[in-house]
C-alpha cells in the first residue's frame, strides 16, 4: 500500500480546471487594487466638486459684501495646497528599516562574547532588543510593523485608509499639512455656502419658491460636518507633534530599557573582557584573547548540552557516587549571567524556581518604573516642531519632506534621563538592602549550624553576586532520577517488619527488670529463628502483596 502511494505521481487539475481558478484570482487581485485606490479617487473627486461649487458662488453676483472673487481665489488656493499635500503623503515612502543597511547584520547565529552598545531606549515585551521576525531585521526606536503594508515603518504613526499607506517619518509632515489645509477648506466652503443661502435664498421669497440650489445646500452640510470632525482630528495631531509623540506612542504603553540594564551590562562587559586591575597586567591582550576562546568553546558546549547525554551532561537517571565538581567562576561571572543550559546543569529545581520568582518580581518592578518615566523623545515644543518641519521656515507650508533624522538614532530628553537615573539609584539601593538582608540571614543560619559541625568548622563566607542562592549547599551531589528513587513503597509492613524491635537488649536499663533467665533466653532465640525460617519460606509467595 505504501509502495503504491509512493510510486503514484501527485494529481494536479487539468488546464480547463486551472484556468477559471487563475482568472478568479486575477479578478480578486484587481478588485483589491481598485478598492485600495478608491479613497484616492473619492478624495480627489469630492474636493474638485467642492471647489467648483465654492468658486461658482464667488463668481456670481451676491448681496453679501465679502463673498466674491477673493473667496473664490482663497478656495482655489486651499484646494491646490490640500491636493498637493495629499498626493505627496500618498506617494512618498514613509521609510522602512529594510531600505537602509544599518543594523542588517547585527544578529548572528555564532556565539559571541562582546556585548553590543545599546543605542535603543525601547525594548520588546520580553525586555530584549526589538526585532521583527516577519521582516527579518532589527527595529529601531519608534518603528513598528504594519500588517497591511507587510513591512516595518520608521516612526510609524498609523496606517491611514484614506491614504492607502502608512504615515511615518518621511510623509508625516505632508499628512499634517493635508489635515490643516482640508480643515480650512471645509470651513471656507461652509462659510461661503451658508452665507449665500442666508442672504440670497431666505431674503428672497420668490427665489426660494422657484428654485433651490441643491449643490450649495449640500456643500454647506458636508463642509460643516467634515470640517467639525476633521478639525478635532487635526488638533489632536498638532498636539502630538508639539509633544513629539506618535499615535501609537500615545495610545499604547511604550516599554523602555530597564534603569539597571546599562549598569549591569557595563559590569558584565568589564568581567568578560578580563579587566584585572589588581592582578596580572603583563599581557592583558593575550589573556583577554584566551578568555574569549574559552568562552567560545563553553558557549558551543552549552548549546549542544542536550545533544549527547552522558558526555556533555549527566544522563537522566544517572547517580553520581561523589559530589559533582564545582565549576570555577569564569572571570567573576555569577550564576545569574550563565546560560539556561549552564543553570540547568549546575542548579537544582528549587534554586531555578527561586530565580524565576525573582525574575518575575524584577519584571513587575520594571513595569512599575516604566509607568513613572516621561516620554523619552519629548525635546520641547520648539525642537519637536523643528524636527518635523525642518530648519528652513520658508518650506514649512510647502509639502516637501524636510524632516530631520534618519529614524535609527533618537535623542532622549533631559527629563527622561534624569527620571531614569533616579529610578536606577533607587533600584540599586533596594538591591543593596536585599543583599544585606540575605547576608545577615545567611550568617545567622551558618552560625547556628556550626555547633553541629564542631569547633574546627570554617567560618561562613558570603558571595554578594548570588543573593537568592545563599542557602545552596556547594557539597551537595547532583540531583538525579533513578529506579531506586522511583521504587514504590507499600503502606503495609513487609513480612518480618514490625514497629517494635524483636530482640531485647539485656543492657537496656528500662528492660533489666523484665529480662528472663538464661534458659528462657535460649528458648526465646530458638523460637525467633523458627519464625524467621517460616517467614522466609512465605516471602517468595507473598511478595506481590507488597505492591499496591
Curated annotation (Swiss-Prot):
* UniProt catalytic activity: L-cysteinyl-[protein] + hexadecanoyl-CoA = S-hexadecanoyl-L-cysteinyl-[protein] + CoA
What membrane topology is annotated for this entry?
A: Multi-pass membrane protein
Disulfide pairs? none
Topological domains on the Cytoplasmic side lie at: 1-32, 92-173, 237-548
Q: Where in the cell is it found?
A: Vacuole membrane
Q: Where is the composition biased (Basic and acidic residues)?
A: 536-548
Changes after translation: Autopalmitoylated.
Could you tell me which residues belong to the region Disordered? 313-339, 463-548
**Physiological role:** Palmitoyltransferase specific for VAC8. Palmitoylates VAC8 at one or more of its N-terminal cysteine residues, which is required for its proper membrane localization.
- Official protein name in the record: Palmitoyltransferase pfa3
Name of the coding gene: pfa3
